[in-house]
A protein has these predicted regions:
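N-terminal non-catalytic cap/leader segment that marks the start of a structured domain
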Residues: 1-108, 276
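A generic local secondary-structure boundary/capping motif
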Residues: 5, 76-78, 98-101, 125-134, ...
Length: 298
């Protein structure tokens, strides 16, 4: 099984490189076609035939090429560090809507995050001094593979490149200050994602996956994606009815029940806490919470 990843060997490098990982081995895509594919987005924008050729080349490299790296020697970043859009669903599991004491929405409820929120699967999450009510939300993320607009639900999965894992970290006090949730969602480092993109060909049905979230080793969320109110296909059909989806766009499909704000007593995140989100057949992200450094005062 291949995973598309963004990585860097040097933590001081200004940008992420694109690679294909298999088990613990990694092939840098810059070695193919004179460096044409230096980003995951450029791979996703390639034609299906070209993608097949790239993956065939990757297989040959893994079988004895000179460009094999070890995943243990690199830092993984967000799989798509430069998406055009990050669309996030809210209230997409019935038990989560119930714990939030909200009605099931008639159409998908969504909001946006931005690139500043993206970090890798093991990067620290910075807890802002402006909030004391930080929460976790484990989610399945859909990565769009082909431009689409006005897509029928029965055809929607054909436009998916693959799937990855996200923690939609949320500052509940900032989120609920207004009817728009952006202030509590689009915070720096609040979308750790990874470890890579598992291709859609390896996950023909995204509605049969088990999602598990752990805080300091304790399971706090466990649910099947079969329980989504709006399936991946239905969500793509809805969004594409009024916006063009592009290769590399990310759709976070909502979190199940078990969020910290609705536990008794509430369980918010603190510096030192470690949150793991794992989805079967895709992988796990593991991020430590770190307090924001306060600015120096004169």
């Amino acid at each position: 099984m291949f995973r598309l990843v963004s990585y860097r060997s040097d933590r001081t490098a200004p940008s992420w490189r694109a690679g294909v990982a298999s088990h613990h081995a990694l092939i840098d895509l810059a070695g193919y076609a004179d460096g044409t594919y230096r980003s995951v987005r450029s791979f996703l924008a390639a034609s299906p035939d070209e993608q097949e050729q790239i993956l065939a080349w990757t297989t040959r490299q893994l079988d004895g090429g000179e460009q094999v790296l070890s995943l243990d020697e690199v830092e993984l970043g967000p799989p798509v560090p430069d998406p055009e859009k990050i669309v996030c669903l809210g209230l997409n599991y019935p038990e989560h809507a119930a714990e939030a004491e909200l009605d099931i929405p008639p159409v998908p409820t969504f909001f946006a995050k931005f690139r500043n929120s993206l970090v890798g699967p093991t990067s620290p999450v910075i807890l802002p001094a402006a909030s004391h009510f930080i929460d976790y939300e484990g989610e399945l993320v859909v990565v769009i593979g082909k431009r689409c607009k006005h897509v029928a639900e029965q055809e929607a999965l054909a436009y998916v490149a693959g799937y990855t894992v996200c923690n939609d970290v949320s500052a509940r006090d900032l989120q609920m200050q207004t009817s728009q949730w952006t202030a509590g969602k689009a915070i720096d480092t609040f979308a750790p994602m990874g470890p890579g993109i598992v291709l859609a060909s390896d996950i023909p049905d995204p509605q049969v996956l088990t999602l598990t979230t752990r805080v300091n080793g304790e399971v706090v969320q466990r649910e099947s994606t079969s329980q989504m109110i709006f399936s991946v296909a239905a969500t793509i059909a809805f969004l594409s009815s009024f916006m063009t989806l592009e290769p590399g766009d990310l759709i976070a499909t909502g979190t199940p029940s078990g969020i910290g704000a609705r536990r008794q007593p509430p369980q918010f995140l603190h510096p030192g806490d470690i949150v793991e989100v794992e989805i079967e057949r895709i992988g796990m992200i593991r991020n430590q919470m770190v307090a924001e450094a306060r600015p120096q005062t004169r």
